[in-house]
């Protein structure tokens, strides 16, 4: 899914909730949920929001273990952590859910491509790209935005539209 929305409309909260739901309720053994961004501080915003949700919920606190490195669901050997393109150890990841934040700031596709490659072993992987329109857009955002716009046009049979049932683009302008 691709979700573009203006600032301060709850992107991080939405992503965090989806990540926690998939961590605990989807039944995926060894689930790896990653909040990713260009830099670690940005990736940690979604993850930290999830940590706050766990701390505020007695039900989640009883099921999950939080550390400085991640949120763990031991019953399913599942993990929710933050990663960034500046991280050196991205190979070997087996993500079930990838929460890609603020793609307007991304310069290249390397991190996203590595996550998508890692998802190939999963039966029902989820990639959620969220972003504001940003200040200086780079290649990744423009490519995703253009493709999403064409898919939306395809759903409503407009000229220039394409049909791709593997993504759900949502653009609020």
Residue ranges and their predicted role:
Residues 1-173:
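Phosphate/NTP-binding elements of NTP-utilizing enzymes
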């Amino acid at each position: 899914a691709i979700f573009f929305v203006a600032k301060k409309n709850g992107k991080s909260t939405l992503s965090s909730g989806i990540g926690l739901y998939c961590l605990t309720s989807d039944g995926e053994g060894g689930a790896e949920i990653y909040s990713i961004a260009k830099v670690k501080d940005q990736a940690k915003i979604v993850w930290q929001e999830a940590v706050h949700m766990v701390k505020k919920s007695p039900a989640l606190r009883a099921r999950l273990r939080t550390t400085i490195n991640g949120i763990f669901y031991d019953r399913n050997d599942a993990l929710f952590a933050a990663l960034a393109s500046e991280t050196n150890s991205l190979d070997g990841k087996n993500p079930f859910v990838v929460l890609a934040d603020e793609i307007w700031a991304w310069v290249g596709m390397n991190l996203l491509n590595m996550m998508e490659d890692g998802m190939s072993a999963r039966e029902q992987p989820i990639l959620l790209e969220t972003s504001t329109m940003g200040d200086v857009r780079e290649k990744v955002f423009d490519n995703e935005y253009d493709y999403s716009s064409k898919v939306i046009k395809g759903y409503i049979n407009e000229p220039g539209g394409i049909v791709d049932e593997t993504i759900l683009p949502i653009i609020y302008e």
